[in-house]
Amino acid sequence: MKSFFKPVIIKKFLWTLFFLFIYVLGTKLTLPFVDMSKAAAMDGTSTTLNYATALMGGNLRSMSLFSVGLSPWMSSMLIWQMFAVSKRLGLSKLPLEVQERRRMLLTLVIALIQSVALVLNLPLQEAAGVDMTTIMVLDTLVLMAGTYFLIWLTDLNAAMGLGGSIMIVMASMIAYIPQDIWNSIQELKISSLWLALMLVFSLVFLYLAVTVERSKYRIPVNKINIHNRFKKYSYLDIRLNPAGGMPIMYAMTLVSIPQYFLLIIHFLQPENQLIEQWIEALSMGSPAWFILYLLTIFILALAFAFINISGDQIAERMQKSGEYIENVYPGGATRRYINGLVTYFALVGAFYLILISGLPMMVVLVDIRYLRLSMIPGIFMIFIGMVFSIKDEVEALTLNDRYRSLL
């Protein structure tokens, strides 16, 4: 705990509080020309999009400047990283400025799609001298500007504060999801006994999630020209769940993307019954949505594992620095060995994520009112990963303070 009271940490923490204040202020700035007395005309898709945006720093409840949140930016980052892993495309070899420019263009496209889909289904009210087309264009631009403002805010927080984009997402989750869970408890009229059992289960699950999050498989690595007494401190760590809780957060967002396209098509073809059926079929709580959600978690768990631990890059780095794994030849053999282990633990992590966060949501197929409660395990895993990420950042910033002077 002493690490959190270092001057550098306190300074960064204060900057983060300032940025969070700006974020909260932005969530109170309502979009112009929106009739807030009426619910957004999104039919059964509102629940799906509400939770997807809340997990990405957005907020569809108040229809504010930051309603879209960081979803376009984080989605573009994920898509770029998945393609950058391939050496054939050569994306990782491009200059950093070119990579950043292309990522931001991809963000622009995704932000445009999401903003248009939301605006087309908002209860807009005409103003004197302003036609509806102008109002739609204006609100779309405001939502896109809000997304890019949040990106700029997270960049500032990454440079001057703690947590980067994590803090924005955590603020969004803390602001709305606990209240939603409490509303569900009151709506379902859950007894005190069941609440006590849920609390005990939550504590047990919290312990299990933290244990799995910090569990690692260590591969001893030998370093040439380093004395043997340091050998025991040289390891290549692979986490039991290499992807962490990120697949859960991204899965909710990616599964909601078809909803945005369907909302746009439904606006253009309001009489199309087939589109309405697809919207209902892909709404949260339907069997099709549930299967797509589990499949997305599984695929993302594998993808994030290889994004976080690239056997090609590690093998190349070890070969250049004179490191090698015991009984494994450098180069191709090392790459295959590491990729094999990553594949094994990625599969373990994928099934673990599906078991812990996916299966509890089966109750939603019976009664959609249990949605918020069934999401608690997944939210815990996302939150735990974020907390440990901030903890690791604090430890890295205070690393030099742990050593005593030799003089």
Swiss-Prot record:
Enumerate the PANTHER family for this protein: SECY/SEC61-ALPHA FAMILY MEMBER
Gene that encodes it = secY2
The name this protein goes by in its record: Accessory Sec system protein translocase subunit SecY2
For this chain, the annotated S-S bridges are none
- Write down the superkingdom of origin: Bacteria
Q: Which family does it belong to?
A: Belongs to the SecY/SEC61-alpha family. SecY2 subfamily.
Where found in the cell? Answer: Cell membrane
Question: Function, please?
Answer: Part of the accessory SecA2/SecY2 system specifically required for export of possible cell wall proteins. The central subunit of a protein translocation channel.
